[in-house]
Amino acid sequence: MKKAFFILITLIGLSNPAFSQTYLGFEYNPNIPVKVGSTTLKHPWTGGINYGQFSTIDFNFDGLEDLVIFDRSGDEFILMEHTVSGALHDYKYVYKGHQHFPECRSRAAFVDYDSDGRKDLFTYGIGGIKVYRNVGNATTGLQWQLITDILQTDYSNNVSNLFVSASDIPAYSDIDFDGDMDILTFHIGGQNVEYHQNQSMELYGVPDSLVFVLKNQCWGKFSEDPNNNILFLNESAYPCENGDIPNPLRDESGRDSTNTRHSGSTLLAIDINNNGVMDLILGDVSYPNITLLMNGGTAPNTNSVMISQDHNYPSAAHPVNMEQFPAMYWEDVDFDGKKDLIIAPNARTVSENQYSVHFYKNTGTNELPEFVFQENNFLQKDMIDHGLGSIPVLVDENGDGLKDLLVANLFRYKPTLSLESVFQLYRNTGTASNPEFTLVNNDYLGLSSLGLGYRVVPAFGDIDGDGDQDLVVGQENGNLRLFTNTAGAGNTMNFSASVPLIDSNGTQISVISHAFPQLFDLNNDGLLDLIIGRKTGELTYYQNKGTASNPAFVPISSNLGKADITTAQEGYAAPHFFRENDTTHLFVGAYNGKVNYFRNIDGHLADGDTFSLFSSSFLDIDAGLYSTVFVDDINGNGLLNLFVGQDLGGIFLFEADPLSTISVEELRLEQKLLLFPNPGNQLVHIISKDGNISDLKLHGIYNMLGQKQEAELIQSTVDVSNLSTGSYYFILENKGKIEHLNFIKN
């Protein structure tokens, strides 16, 4: 039974054909090959990487270190399983790998602080560091125990949170070589590195505790220049003037506030030359390079003066040049037992997001590493990855009868310190039954030079009746523009210069901002209508009341179906209507990365009508941020494919699975809520099987005609006395999960 990656959505009705049995079951199925040039990508449908933080952990307790990437773009985990086939080691993407980890923000690093052989999790807590201990095993899998919401340290009898800025990455390392994990981090507002020594070995003789004292306010005896990335070595100004401090009082009086600079730094502590003291690699928010500081000391805790700095590290031939804010990670990523150097940006939105994982192979040893540049797109080269916020659309671009894949984006990084929005065209170089996509154009239509802004959204449809597909694009400013295809049926698309798309009154069509259009015959009259998602979360509907060759878009509703998907300040509604078994369905992508599924659409298109929300988290899909959806049977096998675009610039691919053994009865068993009494005629109580009701919401009660009934939820009770005798279904939400419960009024 495929329960790991499969959820079957079953729609059951009684008398109305619109509620006849329909299955929309999708399984993550990355089975369509994708090529760049002659190279077939190994992980095309894994979703991409923007601003990754790299660690390793044995997530399935098979003795192999797997790769975990925490991406700051949407605070999301990417899990790559270490697989072995004969002598071949490789990575395999684990769909929904994020479910193995607790929710984290800003940063995540896996370090075995208690030396039990299981790596623990260090992430951002407000003002510092939150810690989870790994208490899993091969039987239960990964399990996490929260050790502290905020790690504490002793500033000379003044215990307070060990401050680490949300933008920083500290060094978790055994600085004094005594067997427990210490921490290096920049001072809260200065240019100096603090050394927080773990007292676990000193106090208890075992490394199983996290008890810190500030051992040195100016570890390494250096400071950053407030105006550039030059470092002052052997610094004599406060707080470095006294060298090492056994356990200093945190005294801010000596600091010059005019020189306070620190706004973002990344640290990696390694004993590069194997001389028994830690050296330090630094990255800075304002500069593209990293700097190696060599420790001239002879023993930990007695002398940590840095004696040299190398701004071209790891080599003059291939120094790090990462726009912007490089961070460093020391992990074995090529399975040779030697830890390599990975460089990735640590600044959201302003950094490189397409060639953003630089791999330096360790050709030396772990004791004396030598890092040699290999590539600037480690793992990314094997994925569909086009920057930030992918938008997949299928269309036959060259008229060969095969649908091609066009990928729009929110934006991608453009050197130097700029951004651009583009379309990438993957031509279908396969067959009708065995599709294969090959990248043929990285800036289709030269979109980046047209000045249309960011997140330009394509929608295709023949709106002038000449047999070819025209193009409507939505802009971030809310405007829509029309590119008329003059190629004719069966030919490669050829577009005239764009013009504003106008409605039936000759007025330019525009919404508040971030227009997301779809051309779809919503009322099934043979004419393509226009639906537009908006940043504010609602859908705008224009019905086409013209002719096949002369469209006339008439505004009908600014809140179609009341399908408002806003869950926070912004919605970024990304609608996709499709028809299956003569029934219209609606998926809506959203800023929160979920996919909303609506039904009860046909016959409910007037302004003020309401669609039924079936799920606000369809298939538990989590795209991080900016989810988008496209549905089509790309290989003609009668099974729908689901393409999901997302924040990290790549795409998830699903296919309907009619062979699942999950039955309707099993789905009922998985329901957590019950209605009692049922049948009933007065007060109906909502009961949770596990006794846990949290943030219970009633989204509606509907009859079998799909008409919403007047009802109010008071605590966990609904008065149904005003309902007519008959069958209904309740749409309830408990702990963020939508459930549909049948009910009979007697």
Where are these regions (language model features)?
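Compositionally biased, intrinsically disordered low-complexity segments
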Residues: T10-S15, I150, E224-D225, F232-S236, ...
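C-terminal outer-membrane/trafficking sorting elements
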Residues: E666-N746
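Intrinsic low-complexity/disordered segments
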Residues: A18, N50, M704-G706
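Intrinsically disordered, low-complexity coil segments
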Residues: N16, L417, T492, E580, ...
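Beta-propeller-forming repeat regions
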Residues: Q21-V664
